[in-house]
Swiss-Prot record:
Cu cation 5 binds at residues 656, 699, 704, 709. Gene3D superfamilies: Cupredoxins - blue copper proteins. One of its GO terms (biological process) is multicellular organismal-level iron ion homeostasis. Belongs to the multicopper oxidase family. This is Ferroxidase HEPHL1. Glycans are attached at residues 160, 235, 406, 588, 771, 934. Cu cation 2 binds at residues 128, 186, 1049.
Amino acid sequence: MFLKQPGGCILLQFLGLLGLVGAVTRTYYIGIVEEYWNYVPQGKDVITGKSFSEDKLATLFLERGPNRIGGIYKKAVYRHFTDGSYSTEIPKPPWLGFLGPILRAEVGDVIVIHLMNFASRPFSLHPHGVFYDKDSEGALYPDGTSGRNKEDDMVPPGKNYTYVWPVREEYAPAPADANCLTWVYHSHIDAPKDICSGLIGPLLVCKEGVLNRYSGMRTDVDREFVIMFTLVDENQSWYLDDNIKQFCTNPNSVDKSDAVFQRSNKMHALNGFLFGNMPEPEMCVGESVSWHLFGMGNEIDIHSIYFYGNTFITRGHRADVVNLFPATFLTTEMIVENPGKWMITCQVSDHLQAGMLGQYSVGNCRGNAPHPKVQGQQRRYFIAAEKVLWDYGPQGYDKFTGFPLNTSGSDSAVYFTQADNRIGGKYWKARYTEYVDATFSRRKMPSDSEAHLGILGPVIKAEVGDILLVTFANKADKVYSILPHGVFYDKASDAAPNVDGFLKPGAHVKPGETFTYRWTVPESVSPTDEDPPCLTYLYFSAVQPIKDTSAGLVGPLLVCKKGTLNADGTQKGIDKEFYLLFTVFDENFSSYLDENIKKFTWHPFSVDKEDKEFVKSNRMHAVNGYMYGSQPGLSMCKKDRVSWHLIGMGTDTDMHGVYFQGNTIHLRGTHRDSLALFPHMATTAYMQPDHSGIFKVFCSTLPHFTRGMGQIYEISSCGNRDPSEPPYGMLRTFFIAAEEVEWDYAPNKNWEFEKQHLDAGGERHGDIFMNHTENWIGSQYRKVVYREYTNGEFVEIKARPPQEEHLQLLGPMIHAEVGDSILIIFKNKASRPYSIAAQGVEDSNNGKLLNVPVTKPGEIKTYRWNVPKRSGPGPSDPNCIPWVYFSTANFVKDTYSGLMGPLITCREGVLNEKGRRSDVDYEFALLFLVFNENESWYLDDNIKKYLNKDPRDFKHTDDFEESNKMHAINGKIFGNLPGLIMTEDSMTNWYLLGIGSEVDIHTIHYHAESFLFKIDKSYREDVYDLFPGTFQTIELFADHPGTWLLHCHVSDHIHAGMETTYTVLRNIDNRIPYSTKTPSGAGSHAVTVPSQEQPGKEELYFFGKNLRPRGAKAALVILFILGLLLLVATVVLALRLRSSRRQMAYREVQSCALPTDAL
């Protein structure tokens, strides 16, 4: 009866409000179980329909033998149960494979995980993308915690643990992000081994209102799918010995260090399936589909994921390929329009042939789906495949050195020397050639603007609404095809080689045959509003895609917004268009290899095609098929509006940092001078050069330039005079010296000891890098570094303040604003020539010299860099953006020897009078680089000093060379980087710097915090992908006190020590000085933050929860509002009760007898 009263209704409303204030708690019961997993349950290659016995490479992975495990492995996996009895498992979609269940939550929710470990060894559960306290981090590392805050790090066999993860607003998808962000959870005792053992699953964090409150499923899309692309390295699994014993027919014959055995255990999988064996995700035409994609793994886990048949939008941009790396998480959104069975593949050559393929099925669930309407222009192309004799160096000499390409001892001689068992620089190749009509009797003569295309096929262009009719004549001697990215085509024009129940004559065009492909450009493949006017794609032959593209069959394709193209096909508002393909043409994979050996080697029968040096000589590091500056046609005028269309192709070593010397490019609202390219990825960038001269464009991945992947572009004044001296404002002067030091990568060795102590079953991966033995140098090396001095006397080194302690090996952090000029007084105090040059800024010798002048030992030289507007942040950039400065005397050796530093350019008004930023509380610059000491100038010195041996007689074994590859952050390994300390509720900017070789793929993960990074808009992440030649500012609001792990998520890099900690101090504890409290096993920089079991006196409790100052304010506001509502409810209830009593008294008076006696 009470609840029917008005006061009761108000109380119900009050309780409802309490329910709104409290978050939805999403509870999961997860069990870790051991099981046997079959990577190919259908027992055949589903893509081709063939038996594995017909594929030599497939048998390597899948066939059992005396020393081969085969396709079935014991693994540990996460499983979802109904309740705490763990007796009833909740089934999951079959396409999810061995991944754990999909966990979902909205911003404001709380995720509670009850984890039960049914496995035979300890494991844990660590999330990305959500908030957690120390007792729910689920990650084992020396962080100075103990007791309850350490119990979460590992759950022993037969035990359980409860993790609590609030999904706070700070982890919410940014406005420009998809409605649900893709994250993962995984075991984190030894993360690489745990993940390879199978313990990983998806976690989706959604904006408020996206999930159904009762079912927990999404309401904003029709379908959602999750796919993990990774090379599952079963050699790293905790169960390797079990698998050898169980599945090898002669376990005693197994050599676990054998390279072929190890390769046989590397499974190139989608959710744990190979060769199309993944159960097909199914959807209907017209449905909205969200694809949640992520990568995991090692240095070779570079994945270019291609969705055949349909395009999608990711981070506001149209594409049909996305790149994934270890711990890269992406959400792509697709409106499905093309019915049929379509492939999902990794287009990295090695991964494609090793089985990283799947399929998805699109049905006509509502009857026959009409083709998307197109009413634009019909554009016709007549393209032939022809066999050609190609010269990678047609001018015969290196444009950068002036020496002949076959000069003995030169870098180029490896590729251009013809000999008994060497082909040299000329090869038979295949090439797409354009003809004028369908008779294919007369080639279309290329214009001057197309002279740079080289081996590339003709540029195909179309606007939205157009129809492309491409008549293909195979005038070569192999079966070929044309398969395009980025356009719409039905099965009649499908050139993909998969068996899907359709006759596809365009997939196999034999020599002498022709076929006409019909491609359309409907609105569904149009560039988005965020995209440039023209999207860059490529087309290629897909009969045997690795052989065909290695032979040369590739060309550029542009999809443009309506009204973008002139009548002659050129782009409106663009004066020059250039198309550059960066790839290592691996002639060893070309279908013409045997013919090239026969024609060009002097003794063909002596050639061993497996010989490492022979194989190396055929890997041609080219731009459009040209090497060492031999590409013609890269010329333009000053002030020209230039569009660069950049394309990648190849294998897992084809990670290219394309660098434009002397100018910057405009890329999605940002200013850069370099960008990263990967196989089958293409990018459009813009440039407006402001100085005439000659400049380099090259791949800054360290070995690639020395191997020939560099060209020269020329800018002529064309009547536009260079300003004699631009009106630059403040002159910022720095006194910098190059000097030699004895450097210790790991002065404190406790990190690895402590990790092994915490995990008694763990391995010591750091010994080879830190131990000084008879044949290992250890952690100390002679190096050369940049150091700042107080004045031009170069006597007193300028002391670094505490906020720069983290720079360590790096040179000083140089700041400048747009409009400034930087004057470097440089003294070479080292023993060999060096220089100092910078990316992003304008050198005083800009365009006059290809190479920066060097400074000899003992000399002093002056270098001047100007900061024009194009060198500062772009419209979408943060207030300050990073570049690097370095020595160019010998870029590769100088870098590995230690010469590198950060240069920060800012918008006007950002720097204070001391040259420091006034808009943030802290800034940190981090260089992630595998310092290859084998390439250092000082290797011989280090052998002499630390091994006491003669370098001429010392044998360089594989182990010795591996021991000299220091996986460092600012020159420190295994938790030795100090100075990453900040206070709670502070705004921090981190400048992430990528330099190095093909192994320098770095995915930087911040535990406990997320951050925003900007391209055209801001996006939320907790891992950032970093590559050679790329630099990025990330914005991190530090609001979670504690000492947290910061590391590269690449498996080998974790084991090699590329990890450290950063500390967020509570506001009440910011009086604690740097480097004062050291947890056991950590480096001297670690700071212990008071445990939440002993909170500070200024904290506030709300329903038993310890809150920090900002949270306390919010809690007080909520308490005030609730108190006010309770007061109102109480008053209303009291008034209602009082009114009820009066009515009751009145009724009693009415029913009593009147006092008639008184009458």
